[in-house]
Each structure stands twice: as structure tokens, then as C-alpha cells.
Amino acid sequence: MAIYNKLLLIFTFFFLYSCSSSYEKLNNANFSPPDSFSKHLFDMYKEKANFEAEKMHDWNSAKLYSEKALEAAKGVKIQPENINYWKIPNEHQTQIKLAYDNLMSIYEPALIHDPYNLANAISSLDCWSEQQEENWQTWDINNCKDSFL
């Protein structure tokens, strides 16, 4: 039993460390994303990571948003998470899937013509999906959904 408890403690430590390392990197370094789309995405995902870590203490979501912000800082053309990534309740899947499909249909032209609103839509759809998966903070769900729309 003592070995089990020690292994559980070690596993917990490494799990928490892995969740917070990208968040710490995001907040302890300066970044200069190479283009306006990447800069908008970086700023929006960093804001979401900070909210999830500092206000909600949701380290899994903070990790996801931190990793996306760090990728955006490198100029990677971030897309929203595939809807299958999330465990969204059945009654909300159709609406979010439609939003995802619509966003992906305008992704390439929006990169050129409207990078700010594209970045907002991508980060808001991830936020909406993440909050809908949790399915209990209606204010947060509606806030993310309204930001997307």
C-alpha cells in the first residue's frame, strides 16, 4: 500500500507539472508572433489560458490554451480543435459542429482578409466547445458562444 501511495503521489506531481509547464513558459517569456493573425491568436489564447489557470483553476484547459498560444507565437496557423476532441453533450453537438464547419469553410480567405475576426472565431469556438463540454457554467458557455457569433 505504501508503494501505491508513493506512485500515486509521483504520478500526481508529474501530471500537475506537465499541465503547468506550458502555462509558465507562456507567462515567463516575451514573444513576438510573426504576423497579425498569429499575434491576435497569441493574445486571445493567452487571455483564455490566464483565465482558466487563475480564475477557474482548470489546468487542463489552461494547458491547451497555453500550447495553442505558444504555437501561434511561432507563426503556426492554428485551427480550432476538431469537434471530436471534445466530449460535448449530444444536444449541443449539432450546433457546434455546424459552427466548426462554417468556420473551416472561410478559414483560408479570412487568413488574408480578416485575420482578427478569424482569430477571434477560432479561439471563441475552442472556448465554447470547452465550456460546453463542462456543461455547467452557463454564463461562460454563453460568453464564448456570443464571442464566436
Segments predicted by a language model, with ranges:
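Sec-dependent signal peptide recognition
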Residues: 3-10
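Long, charged/polar, soluble alpha-helical segments
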Residues: 19-149
